[in-house]
């Protein structure tokens, strides 16, 4: 097959796939040879060859065979001078063939030459959320190490650990800390070039650079930053070309002693389909886990949010126990917890009511159902009996000795706090007791927590053991 014949086929492909697809994926193909039923093309990158093979190979094979060429499959090879190959203005053979065939087609223009500053305008950092600062980040035992490491990096001093990798589940504060670092660096070290973006944005911009043949500009941009921050790095798992470019960018920045900060939803070694060399690089710095929030941290987050809402809802009253109730019932996701509080304040302001337990349970019924604890009454009974070194039958049974009655009341209180069971249901699980007995026991423990330090400590120890 001649270059002129391939040029004619290109015009047919242009009409079939459209201008954008043709310019991006078909026009860069260079026909080289037809050998033993295999049509060989050169491409700028492996990524482009793989994409064309997966998405356009059937169409190209059809057009080749329809034109009388016996082609069984396509082969793509990366050009020797790629990726620095200059953009071509137009394919002379294709233009000549089109003219000879008198086929009028839209002009296929080459990507325009741009300077680095123009590309930089198109690769701006992701916007930072003004709410996500260190001042608004509530610190507790589950996140204190991550917070301390983020603080150290945000000082902009000598690079002591590279990269810093923050990982943890959804809604635990990874993105908050990433934004806080960026904000702090902008204030303390405004001369530094800080680039924050998600791994998804990194991939899309990499693909854009491939399409527009600006890989050298792309490499220069990402290698010229002083601090590179990539959120949700697990997104590039399984994307070989993006991982390769990320790996080379990573190495180049580390070699220049530039700071890299990464976040992920799990430890680097546990990210499936992430290349071993990328995992190894991520693990060579400081890897910090943001643990699931405990009760104290959740309560602190709620108290901080309430203070913020006071400016918007100055007249709203929130009853005692509501924040504690929410901190106990919504334990898996801080975003859900904050969203529940936002909904609660908005609803109360619209209906003009105090935020009490009744309104809370009505307004957040769906959230509370979704966050319902898996802790059972039986589990609480066993844990309390073990803690006080008494038999399970003594907690459930009719004995009224103080050594049994107080643990029984503690168990009832924990059942009320940690399960969705009603008072009558709890009473039935405690030897068929009346709901008023349960109510009395719960109230008694609430009173003793304020006056008896040992009871307060017992309840908290048991709560932590049950929530662990």
From Swiss-Prot:
Keywords annotated in UniProt: ATP-binding, Cytoplasm, DNA replication, DNA-binding, Lipid-binding, Nucleotide-binding
Keyword DNA-binding tagged: yes
Principal location class: cytoplasm
Pfam families documented for this protein: Bac_DnaA, Bac_DnaA_C, DnaA_N
Stretch list, region Domain I, interacts with DnaA modulators: 1-90
Sequence segments annotated as region (Domain II): 91-126
GO MF annotations in UniProt: ATP binding; ATP hydrolysis activity; DNA replication origin binding; lipid binding
Region (Domain III, AAA+ region): 127-348
Classification via CDD domains: AAA, Bac_DnaA_C
Membrane-spanning parts: none
Keyword Cytoplasm: yes
Gene3D superfamilies: 1.10.1750.10, 1.10.8.60, 3.30.300.180, P-loop containing nucleotide triphosphate hydrolases (3.40.50.300)
Highest taxon of source: Bacteria
Gene Ontology terms describing biological process: DNA replication initiation; regulation of DNA replication
Compartments it resides in: Cytoplasm
Residues reported to bind ATP: 171, 173-175
GO cellular component, one term: plasma membrane
InterPro entries cross-referenced by the UniProt entry: AAA+_ATPase, Chromosome_initiator_DnaA, Chromosome_initiator_DnaA-like, Chromosome_initiator_DnaA_CS, DnaA_C, DnaA_dom, DnaA_N_dom, DnaA_N_sf
Domain IV, binds dsDNA, as annotated region: 349-468
Function: Plays an essential role in the initiation and regulation of chromosomal replication. ATP-DnaA binds to the origin of replication (oriC) to initiate formation of the DNA replication initiation complex once per cell cycle. Binds the DnaA box (a 9 base pair repeat at the origin) and separates the double-stranded (ds)DNA. Forms a right-handed helical filament on oriC DNA; dsDNA binds to the exterior of the filament while single-stranded (ss)DNA is stabiized in the filament's interior.
UniProt family annotation: Belongs to the DnaA family.
HAMAP family linked: DnaA_bact
Quaternary structure note: Oligomerizes as a right-handed, spiral filament on DNA at oriC.
Domain remark in the UniProt entry: Domain I is involved in oligomerization and binding regulators, domain II is flexibile and of varying length in different bacteria, domain III forms the AAA+ region, while domain IV binds dsDNA.
Name of the protein in its database record: Chromosomal replication initiator protein DnaA
Organism: Ruegeria pomeroyi (strain ATCC 700808 / DSM 15171 / DSS-3)
Gene field: dnaA
């Amino acid at each position: 097959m001649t270059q002129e014949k391939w040029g004619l086929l290109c015009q047919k492909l242009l009409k079939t796939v459209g201008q954008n697809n043709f310019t991006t994926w078909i026009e860069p193909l260079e026909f080289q040879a037809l050998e033993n039923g295999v049509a060989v093309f050169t491409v700028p990158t492996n990524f482009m060859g793989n994409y064309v093979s997966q998405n356009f190979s059937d169409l190209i094979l059809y057009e080749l065979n329809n034109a009388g060429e016996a082609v069984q499959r396509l082969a793509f090879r990366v050009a020797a001078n790629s990726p620095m190959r200059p953009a071509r203005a137009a394919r002379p053979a294709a233009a000549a063939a089109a003219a000879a065939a008198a086929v009028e087609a839209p002009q296929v223009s080459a990507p325009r030459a741009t300077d680095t500053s123009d590309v930089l305008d198109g690769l701006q950092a992701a916007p930072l959320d003004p709410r996500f600062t260190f001042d608004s980040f509530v610190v507790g035992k589950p996140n204190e190490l991550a917070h301390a490491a983020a603080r150290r990096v945000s000082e902009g001093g000598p690079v002591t650990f590279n990269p810093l990798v923050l990982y943890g589940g959804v809604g635990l504060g990874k993105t908050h800390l990433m934004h806080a670092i960026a904000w702090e660096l902008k204030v303390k070290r405004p001369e530094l070039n800080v680039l924050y973006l998600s791994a998804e944005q990194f991939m899309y911009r990499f693909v854009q650079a491939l399409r527009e043949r600006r890989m050298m500009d792309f490499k220069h941009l990402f290698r010229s930053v002083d601090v590179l921050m990539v959120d949700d790095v697990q997104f590039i798992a399984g994307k070989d070309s993006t991982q390769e470019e990320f790996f080379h960018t990573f190495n180049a920045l580390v070699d220049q002693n530039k700071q890299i900060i990464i976040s992920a939803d799990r430890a680097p070694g546990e990210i499936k389909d992430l290349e071993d060399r990328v995992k190894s690089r991520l693990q060579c710095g400081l890897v910090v886990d943001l643990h699931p929030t405990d009760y104290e941290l959740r309560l602190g987050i709620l108290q901080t949010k309430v203070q913020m809402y006071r400016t918007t809802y100055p007249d709203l009253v929130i009853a005692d126990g509501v924040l504690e109730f929410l901190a106990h019932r919504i334990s898996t996701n801080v975003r859900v917890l904050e969203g529940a509080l936002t909904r609660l304040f908005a609803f109360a302001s619209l209906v003009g009511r105090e935020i009490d337990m009744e309104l809370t349970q009505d307004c957040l019924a769906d959230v509370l159902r979704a966050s319902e604890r898996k802790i059972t009454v039986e589990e609480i009974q066993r844990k309390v009996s073990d803690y006080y070194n008494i038999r399970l039958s003594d907690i459930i049974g009719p004995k009224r000795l103080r050594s049994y009655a107080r643990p029984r009341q503690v168990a009832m209180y924990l059942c009320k706090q940690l399960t969705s069971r009603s008072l009558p249901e709890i009473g039935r699980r405690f030897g068929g007791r009346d709901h008023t007995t349960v109510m009395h026991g719960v109230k008694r423990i609430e009173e003793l927590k304020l006056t008896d330090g040992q009871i307060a400590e017992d309840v908290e120890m048991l709560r932590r053991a049950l929530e662990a």
